[in-house]
Regions:
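A short, polar/charged loop/turn motif at coil->beta-strand junctions and beta-hairpin connectors
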Residues: 7, 23-25, 72, 281
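Structured beta-strand/loop patches that form or line metal/cofactor-binding pockets in enzymes
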Residues: 11, 15-37
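Short, highly charged low-complexity linear segments
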Residues: 2, 25, 136-138
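Extreme N-terminal tail/first-helix region
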Residues: 1-18, 214
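Acidic, metal/ion-coordinating pockets
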Residues: 39-380
Length: 380
């Protein structure tokens, strides 16, 4: 039987294997774009990923409970906030370097595209940036935000993806690089949205953003999505700078603004502004989903969600839009002394056999997601 998208969302949150093709009598096609937060491999997480039996790193058990939701979506994106390398020694905060095996495990879990522009992208210098992109290429993962050459920047500043039949142009930016300068002569390496990325971090490069978005509009995709590393760490509300920047992006053509960096969830909303062409434009903004994986221990840095954004294309009108969203609350559960310490745990329901302490933590995570992210909107 045909399923409307709102029904599909709820079905794939409970039984992803049973989700079929979407049909809609009105001539509209609707698909789901999954969005996750910051992928961080602090050393406790890296150590936990080591599998003695395999003699190799394997992150997949850590986020196995999120994988069905990623795989049920038509496309899945996140922010990769570490560098990757085939060789150690590995490190966590403040200069991240993680096993390249993470890339393959993320691809196997269901991710399609990763933002690589963030404040940790130069933690291991130019070589680390290159080895990260090499690892992602080897795993078959698309990426936006950093580049190995001027030619790559010219070709890949905008990544066009087929999201279940809806074309989406993805762009990626970061506010800065933790005071590490972009290598001289390689200004193409990192997509920065601030002109003062080494100092005050307060002056957006409006010319660059407007130029990039004009180029994205010229591709005539159904939608444009901007993945952006911004905001203030550990704040559960957006600030006025984020709102102003979101408005600038939406005004110039962005339909989705997908943020990260705060390490805790921040709200989801729709914003309406005057567009570059004088028309009224409405854009979807997720300011942050917090950490997808990490070993930060605050209850809110452990709290995240797998967000699915509903994208609908009216085939008769030839237009696409965001028509709703839903999410599954997740909690990073740490069990010291066990074979697997870290488990990103589905907090949408209490699993059978959960003790009272775990049940309380999962209920708190779900409540925090509702309070911070807001209520889902589907089928609209």
């Amino acid at each position: 039987m045909a399923m409307n998208y709102s029904d599909k969302v709820m079905e794939h949150f409970t039984n992803p294997q049973n989700v079929g093709e979407i049909e809609n009598a009105s001539g509209c096609g609707t698909v789901g774009n999954a969005v996750c937060g910051d992928i961080m491999s602090h050393m406790p997480v890296t150590n936990d990923a080591w599998d003695e039996g395999q003699g190799a790193y394997d992150y997949s058990p850590i986020f196995a409970q999120a994988a069905p939701y990623l795989q049920a979506a038509d496309y899945a994106v996140a922010n990769l906030e570490t560098t990757l390398s085939e060789t150690g020694p590995y490190s966590g905060y403040p200069a991240f370097k993680s096993p390249a095996a993470l890339a393959g495990d993320l691809a196997e879990a269901g991710f399609d595209l990763l933002l690589t522009a963030n404040n940790h992208c130069l933690d291991r210098g130019w070589d680390g940036l290159v080895s990260t992109l090499d690892a992602l290429d080897g795993a078959g993962l698309a990426h936006v935000g950093t580049c190995r050459s001027a030619e790559e920047r010219a070709e890949n500043t905008i990544h066009v993806a087929d999201v279940g039949g809806i074309s989406v142009a993805f762009l990626g930016y970061t506010y800065g690089t933790n005071g590490i300068p972009v290598p001289q002569g390689r200004e193409y390496a990192v997509s920065l949205f601030n002109t003062d990325y080494m100092t005050t971090l307060s002056t957006p490069d409006t010319g660059r953003l407007e130029e990039d978005l004009a180029a994205a509009r010229a591709l005539d995709t159904d939608l444009i999505a901007v993945m952006i590393h911004w905001g203030v760490e550990y704040q559960t509300t957006q600030n006025s700078y984020q709102e102003e920047l979101a408005d600038l992006l939406i005004s110039n053509g962005a339909d989705l603004v997908l943020g990260g960096h705060s390490h805790v969830p921040q709200p989801i909303e729709q914003r309406t502004v005057a567009g570059w062409d004088g028309t009224e434009r409405t854009g979807f903004v997720c300011y942050s989903l917090g950490n997808f994986i990490s070993s930060q221990v605050d209850p809110l840095t452990d709290t995240t969600a797998v967000l699915t954004v509903e994208l609908t294309r009216d085939n008769a009108a030839g237009e696409a839009s965001v028509t709703g969203w839903d999410y599954v609350p997740m909690l990073m559960v740490r069990r010291d002394g066990t074979e697997r310490v870290f488990t990103l745990t589905d907090a949408s329901s209490i699993p059978a056999g959960a003790d009272s302490a775990l049940a309380a933590r999962l209920e708190e995570a779900a409540a925090n997601c509702r309070e911070i992210l807001g209520e889902p909107r589907t089928g609209g």
